[in-house]
Amino acid sequence: MTSATASTSPADRTTAPKPFSLRDATPADVPAIHAIYAHHVLHGRASFEEVPPTLDDMQRRFAEVQCKGLPYLVAEREGEVLGYAYASSYRTRSAYRFAIEDSIYIDHRRVGEGLGQALLAELIARCETGPWRQMVAVIACTAGGEGAGSLAVHERLGFRTVGRLEAAGFKHGQWIDTVLMQRVLGAGANTLPE
């Protein structure tokens, strides 16, 4: 378990930062993960799903990540799941087996507390101990600035922009671009895989 402290804005510095911890997700966390994701599906544009998956669907997705040996993390404070992050296969074809994609979702009431950056940093650290060589982020961005925070967090943690698909999605009455970012894990392409 990793401990971190929530960031605070200048106006909030009169109160002590609220610590949160990062840990491996368990099946017991899936209902909270489902609630966080369902909110983003219904009200946001980060996910291109338009109908929230069922709890059974989320349990199956969780199990698939775990069966592949990929990390699935939650941030929690006093037993409450505040956000989650996981790595999944970037694509299903076998030549992509050393490339993974990150996904991070934060409870909409907790955005701006440093959870996303802490989760991503821990996810990267975990993935660098595995066989994977590249991490890809697929980030939804709108003309109104949605996605800018995720782009900034990824950039701070070593990702670089490698492409942009313009107007690749349409959700909640707005066109959405997809920005592709990439980060080397471990030796990257400098050595052949074992």
Q: Language-model features: where?
A:
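Acyl-donor-binding surface of acyltransferase catalytic domains
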Residues: 1-17, 155, 183-185
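A short beta-loop-alpha structural element at the N-terminal edge
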Residues: 21-33
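Acetyl-CoA-dependent GNAT
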Residues: 24, 52-109, 120-121, 126, ...
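Conserved GNAT-fold acetyl-CoA-binding loop/helix
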Residues: 34-61
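Conserved catalytic-core motifs of GNAT/GCN5-like acyltransferases
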Residues: 86, 138-140, 151, 155-177, ...
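A short, internal acetyl-CoA/4′-phosphopantetheine-binding micro-motif in the GNAT/acyltransferase core
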Residues: 103-112, 139-143
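Conserved acetyl-CoA-binding loop-helix of GNAT-fold acetyltransferases
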Residues: 112-127, 148-156
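Conserved GNAT acetyl-CoA-binding A-motif
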Residues: 127-142, 146
